[in-house]
Amino acid sequence: MESIKKVMVFGSGPIVIGQAAEFDFSGSQACKALKEEGIYTILVNSNPATIQTDTDMADKVYLEPLHPTIVEKIIEKERPDAILPTMGGQTGLNLALELHRRGILDKYGIKLLGSNIRTIEIAEDRELFAEAMAEINEPVTKCKAVNSVDEAVEFAEEIGYPVIVRPAFTLGGTGGGIAHNKEELIDITSKGLKYSIINQVLIDESVLGWKEFELEVMRDRKDTCIIVCGMENIDPMGIHTGESIVVSPIQTLPDEFYQKLRNAAIKIIRHLGIEGGCNIQFAVNKEMTEYRVIEVNPRVSRSSALASKATGYPIARIAAKIAIGKTLDEILNDVTKETPASFEPTLDYVVVKIPRWPFDKFKTVDKKLGTSMKSTGEVMAIGRSFEEALQKAIRSLDIGRFGIIGDGKDKDYTDEEIEEILKNPTDERIFVIAKALEKGWSVEKIVELTDIDEFFIKKIKNIVDMKKELEKLKEEIKKLNA
């Protein structure tokens, strides 16, 4: 990689739901990492309200639209040796694909770093993805890419309802949803086709209610692979990972099954030839006997930012250095200053991420959570136990709550309201679970209604039980002082 002296980095453009400050964080790290290695860095981003567009972040900053015609003019002027698109989220990958399709990369002899064109296409084209996974015997859901409503209806009737509708080349589940019948499918597919840049939606077999896990994987040019972080979505499949409460390290997966997912993740990143960071999502059935590979993001993702902050392992920085030819054993860990980046981080604490929804500002928006993102931010908290981290995260949300219960701001839900929210989750579900437990609902009933693992419901029950215990002690102290 000695021939690479000048690299162009794509930002992610305007802040939208599903693509926000996480990519500014990643892009800033990448620019600093490239400059550390003496690489002349050119940043292209249309959003001036970012850290990465500060003048000291890159050698040259272009505040221009992330459009192939504009970017070609910048390429013609700057003549970069390579482009790093994997720090710009879905926008960066889509732009790299379009530059390739227009022949601009070949015309100027530009190398693509991090992920190659075939890998990007496999990750985004569901049929290519299914074929790639079949080549290495990794299970995926039954799916089909369709370009019309009629095709969608035909395939849904073949595999049975419900089905998941996912527009191709979009972020945050935009335009997608869960169709339980033909009418819903027609409605969601019609909208989804408009959102997709290639007018294509993916009809997926439903794995609603299965557990969802994510692994952040790193690989270098010498084929060294490590798992940086394992994350568990508390909410089941059917709720977008950006809408779910997430905990790290993984809490409910037996080690034997975790090793299965770990081996699968390493097999996938090797097969796709990704050099740098990669996020892989798995669905696991409740009995923990089967899994499906749901998605591969061949780029730094929203989850990568969480994994970086949870572990202290700077994924974007190291991915940028790998992209220009460094190997994991050549890069020092920023935290220890001694061990190489090829050592997998281990956590002796619990990290909880909770999304922040803007429903206080948009009062007429449907609050139900599903496969499309509605949250506009998130908080992360660290504790020695799940209970501690959860309570800290709730307090950090800036919604006026000091915990899930017992702060004097609990709503008084009826049993009917509780059952409805447990079945059809909204942003209030975590508080409703606590209220149900306080009212004497059994753990088993809540598990049945929510599909959330019993482990997490019992952890929330510990908080509720502590509240009751403290109330008893308060009464006893009053008697003693009387």
From Swiss-Prot:
State which residue ranges cross the membrane: none
| SMART domains listed in its UniProt record | CPSase_L_D3
As cofactor, the record names: Mg(2+); Mn(2+)
The chain positions of domain ATP-grasp read 130-324
The pathway to which it is assigned is: Amino-acid biosynthesis; L-arginine biosynthesis; carbamoyl phosphate from bicarbonate: step 1/1; Pyrimidine metabolism; UMP biosynthesis via de novo pathway; (S)-dihydroorotate from bicarbonate: step 1/3
Provide the binding site for Mg(2+) 1.
Answer: Q281, E295
Q: Which UniProt keywords apply?
A: Amino-acid biosynthesis, Arginine biosynthesis, ATP-binding, Ligase, Magnesium, Manganese, Metal-binding, Nucleotide-binding, Pyrimidine biosynthesis, Repeat
Listed GO biological process terms: 'de novo' UMP biosynthetic process; L-arginine biosynthetic process
**Binding positions (Mn(2+) 1):** Q281, E295
Q: According to the UniProt record, where is the region Carboxyphosphate synthetic domain?
A: 1-398
Entry's Gene Ontology molecular function annotations: ATP binding; carbamoyl-phosphate synthase (ammonia) activity; carbamoyl-phosphate synthase (glutamine-hydrolyzing) activity; metal ion binding
The reply to whether Manganese figures as a keyword in the UniProt entry is yes
**Binding-site positions, ATP:** R126, R166, G172, G173, E205, V207, E212, G238, I239, H240, Q281, E295
Q: Binding of Mn(2+) 2: at which residues?
A: E295, N297
Name the catalysed reactions.
hydrogencarbonate + L-glutamine + 2 ATP + H2O = carbamoyl phosphate + L-glutamate + 2 ADP + phosphate + 2 H(+); hydrogencarbonate + NH4(+) + 2 ATP = carbamoyl phosphate + 2 ADP + phosphate + 2 H(+)
Superkingdom of origin organism: Archaea
Q: Which InterPro entries does its entry note? A: ATP-grasp, CarbamoylP_synth_lsu_oligo, CarbamoylP_synth_lsu_oligo_sf, CbamoylP_synth_lsu-like_ATP-bd, CbamoylP_synth_lsu_CPSase_dom, PreATP-grasp_dom_sf
Which residues are involved in binding Mg(2+) 2?
E295, N297
| EC numbers | 6.3.4.16, 6.3.5.5
* PANTHER family with a match to the protein in the record: CARBAMOYL-PHOSPHATE SYNTHASE [AMMONIA], MITOCHONDRIAL, CARBAMOYLTRANSFERASE FAMILY MEMBER
General function of this protein: Large subunit of the glutamine-dependent carbamoyl phosphate synthetase (CPSase). CPSase catalyzes the formation of carbamoyl phosphate from the ammonia moiety of glutamine, carbonate, and phosphate donated by ATP, constituting the first step of 2 biosynthetic pathways, one leading to arginine and/or urea and the other to pyrimidine nucleotides.
Describe the family membership recorded for this protein in Swiss-Prot or TrEMBL. Belongs to the CarB family.
Q: What is known of its domains?
A: Corresponds to the N-terminal section.
User: What is the protein's given name?
Assistant: Carbamoyl phosphate synthase large chain, N-terminal section
Organism source for this protein? Methanocaldococcus jannaschii (strain ATCC 43067 / DSM 2661 / JAL-1 / JCM 10045 / NBRC 100440)
Name the lineage.
Archaea, Methanobacteriati, Methanobacteriota, Methanomada group, Methanococci
Gene that this sequence comes from: carB1
